Amino acid sequence: MIAKSFIASFLFLCFAFSGVKADGCSEENGYYYCNQASEVEFTNVGYSSTYNEITNMDTSSCSCSSTPKSYGGNLAPFDEEFSFHFRGPIELKRFAVYYPDTSNALSSLRKRSNNQHMKRHPHHKRDDVIDSTLTVYETVMYTTAVYGDSATTPAASEAQASSDILSSLASLSSASTDNLAASVTPTTVAASVASSVDTDSASATISSVVDSATSSVSTVIPSSIISAAPPDSASESTPASTSYASSTTSATSTSTTSGSSGSSDWGRSSFYEADSGTSDNIVFLNNMGGSAGSGVWSSCFGNSLSFAASNGVDGASSSQVLENILVASDKEFSIWTATECNNDCGYYLPGIPAYHGFSGAKLVLMEFIMPHDSSSSYNQDMPAIWSLNAQIPRTLQYGNADCSCWTTGCGEFDIFEVLSTGNEKMIPTLHGSQGSSNGNGGGAGSSDYFARPTSSSMIGAVIYDTSSSGIYIIDVTDQNVSFDSTYSASDVDAWLQSGATIVQLSS
């Protein structure tokens, strides 16, 4: 897995023209970080395309076969089954998955047939090598009021700005990439939107939650395109994207997350608690296949998935509950449902413990600590929490790129990832084909970051909202979240925060 932020390849060229360093951003070990965030919202998530679904893995020839699989719709392909992965140093305290309708939580699984880039670093969670270049543009937040009781049109100034953007993009589209690379200066890394706010859809969404409410919707615009005002006045009237907290999107505009469940409660489907040793509808796996009675090993594909021992590190012959333990640097384990595949998971490597992942609209809660640790020379002190299209680990997570769907864009979501040794900033990134014509080269990421919890635990919430095509990552540590068996829509709405960092994927 490559740890970097992606945006649409066409916009990469356009945004690279800006050579102005964004205020508030700083470079650390080759990466650019801006503001600490309490919430990051990925919007406009969902794409129609194909990826290569693996159909066979041959241990005699070390080759794999695949066939194109179509996908599409809101959140696609991130609405498919995904597994959750954890790399040390990490102490996982609690983990839970909720669905809008408890009675349908597991049955829905059986129904499924189922950029400029940031600088690449050597510590990949995957072995695939992807060409990458440093992101080098500044963005500003252009804020327009949207009224929930009417589908108002953008202000004239915004409409003009949007028109200027489109004209600028068209004029830049034939630019030489060599000239771009030679003329840029490192600035903010963020996914950006070069379009006007869709006020019709925004108003309809907001009004479904709050009648006659006023909120603000922010459009991220490359600074190289906004040239009408002098630098001083621009900095006063259009704050830089590195000041997301001051360019707020109100909670009412994001509270549509509850639209996935309507007025229903979120019901808990899976739960783990380290202190009590409780585990319900959860299976812990790792990549130690063939070493302790589960999974397989081959010279072609190495160690497959296996049951994880209670220490999270070793293999086991049967399912075990993860202990209340620190998993050291560079060690990984994953979480799945306890529902075994029964000719309903597609192809997977024969001999592995094959389980369903988590799909569709859902709420994921996780409590964890990421203390510093120097026990490994590789991936030292670089913890991460991420999710993968479940087909990837069930075939080949690390190794021959032709033996998983990863490179063709079936989906990876880095939720809380530390990019360099000892760093205390965690960033989120979506990896997929959306916004790219080249396999997994699309997606989006944010250089606004979450603070790494090194001494006390953090509780993170991830909401997958199929109704609004949004994925929300929220730090709910101070929200008195206790991993209850159910949550009401209003409970979840209360977690959403104003001033969230908004990352909108290109269509």
UniProtKB/Swiss-Prot annotation:
Q: Please tell me one Gene Ontology term that the record gives under cellular component.
A: endoplasmic reticulum
Q: Which residues cross the membrane?
A: none
A Pfam family recorded for this sequence: YJL171C_Tos1_N
Q: Which Gene Ontology BP terms does the record give?
A: cell wall organization; fungal-type cell wall (1->3)-beta-D-glucan biosynthetic process
> What is the originating organism of this protein?
Schizosaccharomyces pombe (strain 972 / ATCC 24843) (Fission yeast)
What UniProt keywords apply to this chain's record, in alphabetical order?
Cell wall biogenesis/degradation, Glycoprotein, Glycosidase, Hydrolase, Secreted, Signal
Tell me its family: Belongs to the PGA52 family.
Task: Give start-end ranges for motif ExDxxE motif.
Answer: 412-417
Q: What is its EC number?
A: 3.2.1.39
Instruction: Please identify the protein, giving its name as recorded.
Output: Probable circularly permuted 1,3-beta-glucanase P23A10.11c YJL171C
Free-text comment on this protein's domains from its UniProt entry: The conserved ExDxxE motif might be important for catalytic activity.
Q: Which domain of life is it from?
A: Eukaryota
Main EC class the enzyme belongs to:
hydrolase
Q: Where is this region: Disordered?
A: 228-266
The residue ranges flagged as biased composition, category Low complexity, are 228-264
* InterPro entries for the chain: YJL171C/Tos1_C, YJL171C/Tos1_N
The reaction(s) annotated as catalysed by this protein in its Swiss-Prot or TrEMBL entry are:
Hydrolysis of (1->3)-beta-D-glucosidic linkages in (1->3)-beta-D-glucans
Q: Has UniProt tagged this entry with the keyword Glycoprotein?
A: yes
Task: Kindly list the places in or outside the cell where this protein is found, as annotated in its UniProt entry.
Answer: Secreted
Its job: Probable circularly permuted 1,3-beta-glucanase involved in cell wall modification through beta-1,3-glucan network alterations such as increased branching or remodeling.
Q: What is the annotated signal peptide range for this record? A: 1-22
**Which Gene Ontology molecular-function terms are recorded?**
1,3-beta-D-glucan synthase activity; hydrolase activity, acting on glycosyl bonds
Residues bearing attached sugar chains per UniProt: N480
- Record keyword NAD present: no
